[in-house]
């Protein structure tokens, strides 16, 4: 199950937690190409030469309509798919084609978000001491972290860490990891980049594998970056959030509910119908462990940066915890405008939260 990270907005009038890591800047980026979810079933079945599967197409249309996703940004275009027809069939050996695209494009999309975060941070790029790069899109050596180091012109001595194949739990896991790095390395300024492109999951429909239709409906492409450090310098750095504590929990006997496997046909996707219920039934135990040390037990009194794995998950958790509609609004908005961005999703929601907070202050 996904990890949780407790995050607190920095407020000069509130009690300070000395020595905790601070989120100093956020940047996000998406491909310029985007698809309208309402018309995507027509495009998908046409580009995969599957228009004769009328019942399957109508089923996919119902899935898209229920997703509460309005649009998604995708690197995949009609031209790219026509050039690489092996991406459009369900079981074609296409891993080489997918890898060639991802190895090139994932670092580039990550660079766009990183440059925005660095610009907001306002400090010289030479002050970045650590780089953590995360993606579920493609595997290569030297990795995307190395490629991004070159693209940005980072110091050759920057301390790098590459995280592959962490899926949807990676966003909160990155917050936990970067908190430890920033707090245990004096003067560290950590650049975190999550860059996701869904080419590995795209393929034509299968009459035997319904999970494939959910994958084609749900995921979008995007990258997010943040700068994190401890003890921000007054007048030079502006903290946005404070990372107070983090925790991670495995729910027993759930490893079969959500599985992705890298095969010759790309990354296959299996999601049990039980996932929304399992998450809803176990989320409160995680919250109690995370917030009890701070005397917090009212889940409507805190702000939420909740990874929206899908609309059903958001609905079930909201209902189970008795949350007001505004608590998960940022998560719903990001899901609607971008789809499920896997590792980048939580950072997109953090960005949405800080924009909302700034707007409310005005």
Swiss-Prot record:
Gene3D superfamilies, per the entry: 3.40.47.10
Keywords: Acyltransferase, Flavonoid biosynthesis, Transferase
GO biological process: one example: polyketide biosynthetic process
InterPro entries cross-referenced by the UniProt entry: Chalcone/stilbene_synt_C, Chalcone/stilbene_synt_N, Chalcone/stilbene_synthase_AS, Polyketide_synthase_type-III, Thiolase-like
Pathway the protein contributes to: Secondary metabolite biosynthesis; flavonoid biosynthesis
One Gene Ontology term of the molecular function aspect: naringenin-chalcone synthase activity
Reaction catalysed by this enzyme: (E)-4-coumaroyl-CoA + 3 malonyl-CoA + 3 H(+) = 2',4,4',6'-tetrahydroxychalcone + 3 CO2 + 4 CoA
EC class: transferase
Family classification: Belongs to the thiolase-like superfamily. Chalcone/stilbene synthases family.
Protein's name according to its UniProt entry: Chalcone synthase A
Organism ancestry: Eukaryota, Viridiplantae, Streptophyta, Embryophyta, Tracheophyta
Primary gene name: CHSA
């Amino acid at each position: 199950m996904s990890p949780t990270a407790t995050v607190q907005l920095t407020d000069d009038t509130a009690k300070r937690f000395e020595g905790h890591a601070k989120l100093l800047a956020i940047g996000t980026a998406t491909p310029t190409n985007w698809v309208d979810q309402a018309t995507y079933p027509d495009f998908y079945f046409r580009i995969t030469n599957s228009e004769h599967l009328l019942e399957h197409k109508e089923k996919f249309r119902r899935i898209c309509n229920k997703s509460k996703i309005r649009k998604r940004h995708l690197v995949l275009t009609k031209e790219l798919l026509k050039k690489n027809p092996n991406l459009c069939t369900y079981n074609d050996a296409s891993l080489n084609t997918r890898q060639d695209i991802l190895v090139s494009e994932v670092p580039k999309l990550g660079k766009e978000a990183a440059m925005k975060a660095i610009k907001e941070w306002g400090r010289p790029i030479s002050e970045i001491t650590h780089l953590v790069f995360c993606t579920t899109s493609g595997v290569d050596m030297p990795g995307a972290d190395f490629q991004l180091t070159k693209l940005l012109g980072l110091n050759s001595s920057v301390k790098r860490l590459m995280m592959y194949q962490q899926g949807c739990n990676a966003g909160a896991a990155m917050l936990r990891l970067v908190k430890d790095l920033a707090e245990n390395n004096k003067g560290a300024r950590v650049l975190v980049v999550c860059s996701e492109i869904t080419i590995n999951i795209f393929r034509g429909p299968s009459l035997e594998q319904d999970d494939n239709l959910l994958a084609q409906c749900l995921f979008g492409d995007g990258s997010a970056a943040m700068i994190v450090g401890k003890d921000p310098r007054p007048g030079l750095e502006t903290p946005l959030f404070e990372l107070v504590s983090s925790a991670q929990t495995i729910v027993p006997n759930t490893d079969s509910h959500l599985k992705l496997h890298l095969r010759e046909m790309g990354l296959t996707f299996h999601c049990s119908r039980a996932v929304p219920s399992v998450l809803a039934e176990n989320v409160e135990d995680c919250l109690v462990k995370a917030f009890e040390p701070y005397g917090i037990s009212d889940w409507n009194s805190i702000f939420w940066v909740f990874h929206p794995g899908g609309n059903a998950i958001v609905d079930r958790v909201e209902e189970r915890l008795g949350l007001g509609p505004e608590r998960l609004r940022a998560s719903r908005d990001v899901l609607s405008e971008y789809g499920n961005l896997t590792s980048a999703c939580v950072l997109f929601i953090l960005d949405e939260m800080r924009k909302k907070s700034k707007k409310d202050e005005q």
